[in-house]
């Protein structure tokens, strides 16, 4: 375990502490009793009971490293669940950066990181003396499957304002969560199996917290949105949830889902000094490594950073979801085409400028000069192969389509970032929404178009709807900020209402809200921003262009299959 002071939101600290019951909440779970705390928000009579760090699985240590999660051990005392759990192991420096961006904290908390991290946080506005049945919203955080944690997302405001039970879960990340040898010795997808285990825990226990196990909505952003999308496709998650929301990430996001990751496993073996005579030997070697040794290995892998100098086909900036035959039986494209998945009501959305600032900055795109010529853009698109998956021979055609209409190098840079946003998020999201709709499930789409007042000073003022920007609205941060503009407070209330209405009924619409059309053959969607309004055919032309380009390419040549043996 290691410590790092992180600037995090302790949203509860902004709350006033009036009107809560005299004694703190104690709730029974299948494993034992847990003690929480009450948090009251100004202007709202009903306090929220908060339980932080409730274990939903056994610590994944020793022989449970690279293994499916096991049920938590029971305890006979009252467990104190009033402080944040450790976050799963990850690069602490990069996590510091992202936490600073995604939380509005004034208070510096010392956060722990540990391999023992399978905990969840519960925020319930229910009167625990009565048997309430409130809708449950289970949040899966983002971070490229290598970063993040539940403490960054305080569910108090959403729970209090919308009368829903919010659960923020954690799951193993990086090597701990997604290391795969492609065989039975380490299938991978451990982090997703943790998510499934958390959903089982919710089914078994959430009624005691005033939640309805028959009304569970899973929602997540970025890799959390991709996780939601994977769970929609997974037979293991059947009947564990009833509605789903993917914000800026789906199972067709190329960087996050691969058939196998044997090539990355090979790289890990070399860096770890492990023999790979057999998978069993390799996995045994990695299980012997200490937590710190695996962290050191994580730093050497340089996750989330694109290599703009080496061979991008040999670079592994992500340890993604893999086809393991269990959680994910086939590639998402096949499962979607066969219409064989959990056809629950589904909201799929993207932000207006997914590659506006945060992602190119984190991934190390050389754009500091703020301008770009066509040749460099074409080269950058090819260097982005691990996340864009565009064959080298198509890169000039693509950059010409997007950048060819202007000679202004500043505009070219902006258009290149639009191209990246479309390839990585826009096109996959629309494709998933269409397939979901065609399988007969109620589907809704949105595009978020607002620049939060929380935005980093470093982010150019022109960037509106950057990756992650909707999170502030979804969790009601502006309602606690005090000095947030009125339009932002109003927008946040609208977004929370849409999300919670959807959690209640599978339809986001309700009294006093702009109409959000269902995503049908006309492809109506909602533009969410200062002027929230319906529009049609989100990214329609762009999707047509990319589908046409990639299908022509696929028809031209037989697929090359490259095997990396372990």
UniProtKB/Swiss-Prot annotation:
Biophysicochemical property: pH dependence: Optimum pH is 8.0 with tributylglycerol as substrate, and 8.2 with retinyl palmitate as substrate. Active from pH 4.5-9.5 with retinyl palmitate as substrate.
Recorded GO MF terms: carboxylesterase activity; carboxylic ester hydrolase activity
Glycosylation site residues: 80
Pfam families: COesterase
UniProt function note: Involved in the detoxification of xenobiotics and in the activation of ester and amide prodrugs. Active towards triacylglycerides containing short-chain fatty acids from C2 to C6, and 1(3)-monoacylglycerols containing fatty acids from C2 to C12. Inactive on long-chain triacylglycerols and diacylglycerol. Hydrolyzes aromatic and alkyl esters and vitamin A acetate. The hydrolysis rate depends upon the amino acid promoiety and the esterification site of the prodrug.
In-chain residues carrying the UniProt-annotated modification Phosphoserine: 379
Record family assignment: Belongs to the type-B carboxylesterase/lipase family.
Signal peptide (from-to): 1-18
Catalytic residues of the enzyme: 222, 354, 467
Short sequence motif Prevents secretion from ER: positions: 563-566
EC number: 3.1.1.1
Protein name: Liver carboxylesterase
């Amino acid at each position: 375990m290691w410590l790092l002071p992180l600037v995090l939101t302790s949203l509860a600290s902004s709350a006033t502490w009036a009107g809560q019951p005299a004694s703190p909440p104690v709730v029974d779970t299948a494993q034992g009793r847990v003690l929480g705390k009450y948090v009251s928000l100004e202007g709202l009579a009903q306090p929220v009971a908060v339980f932080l760090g409730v274990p939903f699985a056994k610590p994944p240590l020793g022989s449970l490293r690279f293994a499916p999660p096991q049920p938590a051990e029971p305890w006979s005392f009252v467990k104190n669940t009033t402080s944040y759990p450790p976050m799963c192991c990850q690069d602490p420096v990069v996590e510091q950066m992202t936490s600073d961006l995604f939380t509005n904290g004034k208070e510096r908390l010392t956060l722990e990181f540990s391999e023992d991290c399978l905990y969840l946080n519960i925020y319930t506005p229910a009167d625990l003396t009565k048997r309430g049945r409130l809708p449950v919203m289970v949040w899966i955080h983002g971070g490229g499957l290598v970063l993040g944690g539940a403490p960054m997302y305080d569910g108090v405001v959403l729970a209090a304002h919308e009368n829903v039970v919010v659960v923020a879960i954690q799951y193993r990340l990086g090597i701990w969560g997604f290391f795969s040898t492609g065989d039975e010795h380490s299938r991978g997808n451990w982090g997703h199996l943790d998510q499934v285990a958390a959903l089982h825990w919710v089914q078994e226990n959430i009624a005691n917290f005033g939640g309805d196990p028959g009304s569970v909505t899973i929602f997540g952003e970025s890799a959390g949105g991709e996780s939601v999308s994977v769970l929609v496709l997974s037979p293991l998650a059947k009947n564990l949830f009833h509605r789903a929301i993917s914000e800026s990430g789906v199972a067709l996001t190329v960087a996050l889902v691969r058939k196998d990751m044997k090539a990355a496993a090979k790289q890990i073996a070399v860096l770890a000094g492990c023999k790979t005579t057999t998978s069993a030997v390799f996995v045994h070697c990695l299980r012997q490594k200490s937590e710190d040794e695996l962290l050191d290995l994580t730093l050497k892998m340089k996750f989330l950073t694109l290599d703009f100098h080496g061979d991008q086909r040999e670079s592994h900036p992500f340890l993604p979801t893999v086809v393991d035959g269990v959680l994910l039986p086939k590639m998402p494209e096949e499962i979607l085409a066969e219409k064989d998945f959990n056809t629950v009501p589904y909201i799929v959305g993207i932000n207006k400028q997914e590659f506006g600032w945060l992602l190119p900055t984190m991934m190390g795109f050389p754009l500091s000069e703020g301008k770009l010529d066509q040749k460099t853009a074409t080269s950058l698109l090819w260097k982005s192969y691990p996340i864009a998956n565009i064959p080298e021979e198509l890169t000039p055609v693509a950059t010409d389509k997007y950048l060819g209409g202007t000679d202004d190098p500043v505009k070219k840079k902006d258009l290149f970032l639009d191209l990246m946003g479309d390839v990585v998020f826009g096109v996959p999201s629309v494709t998933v929404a269409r397939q979901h709709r065609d399988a007969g499930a109620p589907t809704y789409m949105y595009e978020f178009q607002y620049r939060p007042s929380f935005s980093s000073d470093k982010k150019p003022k022109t960037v509106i709807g950057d990756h992650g920007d909707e999170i502030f609205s979804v969790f009601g941060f502006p309602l606690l900020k005090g000095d947030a503009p009125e339009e932002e407070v109003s927008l946040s209330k609208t977004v929370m209402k849409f999300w919670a209405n959807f959690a209640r009924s599978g339809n986001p619409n309700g009294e006093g809200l702009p109409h959000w059309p269902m995503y049908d053959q006309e492809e109506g969607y909602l533009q969410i921003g200062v002027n929230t309004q319906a529009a049609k055919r989100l990214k329609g032309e762009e999707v047509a262009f990319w589908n046409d380009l990639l299908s022509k390419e696929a028809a031209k040549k037989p697929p090359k299959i490259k095997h990396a043996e372990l």
